């Protein structure tokens, strides 16, 4: 009997070595390290990674999170069908703006597939190899999107176990890949037919299975804080929104540039203190403060080398601002 349970995954190393363009310091009188926000602000700019149980819809889970924390707004990223379990990140309040960025990295699942006729491990591995890379996929009949043919990338297909006609495998794939349809297509390629028996998501963007908590854990943590003033558990189960943006390359700006960006300005070369290696033109980048706070996201108009060598010009076209205006003092002048 093959069961889908929690698996151990490697810890993500989110410490990136940045290139210094200009040595500057930050003023600790305003702003703060995202992990040291007041608990009320952590909730306002936070993410709860729920271990979704079998049964409820993803929308129901988001609603429960909103009710538990007494919030006005909460939203999930990457819908899971009611019968599917696993990693479901739920953004809280202001952090809901970051959800579109969660779909950039691939997702990972562990799937139990049932073959309608037996097949050898050798044949299964051969077909897995054929399905690794870019594949054509038409969404299933019950999908909430138009059933047009789409291209999706399968990064990895790994056979974990086989017990008769039951096949347990891990798949790392592009966001928007239908695993149910993948099982059917694999069965067709094997000549056996197949269907998805069980599915568990183990990773969604930067959020891993090790980050996931049960809804009861969230409720208990909230009660501990409200009734006893104990923040420890709530800080454990709520991640700052920056945690879900670690996959993006960074452009770190000076304190003097932050409020201008919050008011809609683009990122100019003169306002940059540090940046990631290997930024390419047109790439989506995260604009951060020197304390590690997410200010905005935008498209890079220059690559890393060009930003380092430039003395003026727009480096990042800002597309979405996350930080509230007034978090940092205004240090810019209006044009007359």
UniProtKB/Swiss-Prot annotation:
Pfam families linked: DKCLD, PUA, TruB_C_2, TruB_N
UniProt cross-references to CDD domains, sorted A to Z: PseudoU_synth_hDyskerin, PUA_Cbf5
Catalytic site: 81 (nucleophile)
EC number: 5.4.99.25
Reactions that this protein is recorded to catalyse: uridine(55) in tRNA = pseudouridine(55) in tRNA
Catalytic class of the enzyme: isomerase
Any one GO MF annotation of this record: tRNA pseudouridine(55) synthase activity
Protein's UniProt keywords contain Nucleotide-binding: no
GO biological process annotation, one example: mRNA pseudouridine synthesis
Keyword tRNA processing: yes
Family: Belongs to the pseudouridine synthase TruB family. Type 2 subfamily.
Function: Could be responsible for synthesis of pseudouridine from uracil-55 in the psi GC loop of transfer RNAs.
Protein name: Probable tRNA pseudouridine synthase B
Organism: Methanocaldococcus jannaschii (strain ATCC 43067 / DSM 2661 / JAL-1 / JCM 10045 / NBRC 100440)
Taxonomic classification: Archaea, Methanobacteriati, Methanobacteriota, Methanomada group, Methanococci
């Amino acid at each position: 009997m093959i069961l889908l349970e929690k698996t151990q995954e490697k810890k993500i190393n989110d410490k990136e070595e940045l290139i210094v363009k200009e040595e500057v310091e930050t003023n600790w009188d305003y702003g703060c390290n995202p992990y040291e926000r007041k608990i009320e602000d952590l909730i306002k700019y936070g993410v709860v990674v729920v271990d979704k149980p079998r049964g409820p819809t993803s929308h129901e889970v988001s609603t429960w999170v909103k009710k538990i924390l007494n919030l006005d707004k909460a939203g999930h990223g990457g819908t899971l069908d009611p019968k599917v379990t696993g990693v479901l990140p739920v953004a809280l309040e202001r952090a809901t703006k970051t959800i579109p960025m969660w779909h950039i990295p691939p997702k990972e699942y562990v799937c139990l597939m049932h073959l309608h006729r037996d097949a050898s491990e050798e044949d299964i591995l051969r077909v897995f190899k054929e399905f690794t890379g870019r594949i054509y996929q038409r969404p299933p009949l019950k999908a909430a999107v138009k059933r047009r043919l789409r291209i999706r990338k399968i990064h990895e297909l790994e056979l974990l176990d086989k017990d008769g006609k039951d096949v347990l495998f891990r798949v790392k794939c592009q966001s928007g890949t239908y695993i149910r349809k993948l099982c059917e297509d694999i069965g067709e390629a094997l000549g056996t037919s197949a269907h998805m028996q069980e599915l568990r998501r183990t990773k969604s963007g930067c959020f891993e299975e090790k980050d996931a908590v049960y809804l009861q854990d969230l409720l208990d943590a909230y009660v501990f804080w409200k009734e006893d003033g104990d923040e420890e558990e709530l800080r454990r189960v709520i991640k700052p929104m920056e945690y879900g943006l670690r996959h993006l390359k960074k452009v770190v700006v000076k304190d003097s540039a932050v409020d201008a960006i919050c008011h809609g300005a683009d990122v100019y070369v003169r306002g940059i203190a540090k940046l990631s290696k290997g930024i390419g033109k047109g790439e989506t980048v995260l604009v951060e403060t020197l304390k590690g706070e997410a200010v905005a996201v935008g498209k890079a108009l220059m690559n890393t080398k060009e930003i380092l060598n430039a003395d003026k010009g727009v480096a990042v076209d800002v597309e979405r601002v996350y930080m509230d205006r007034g978090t940092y003092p205004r240090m810019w002048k209006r044009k007359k």
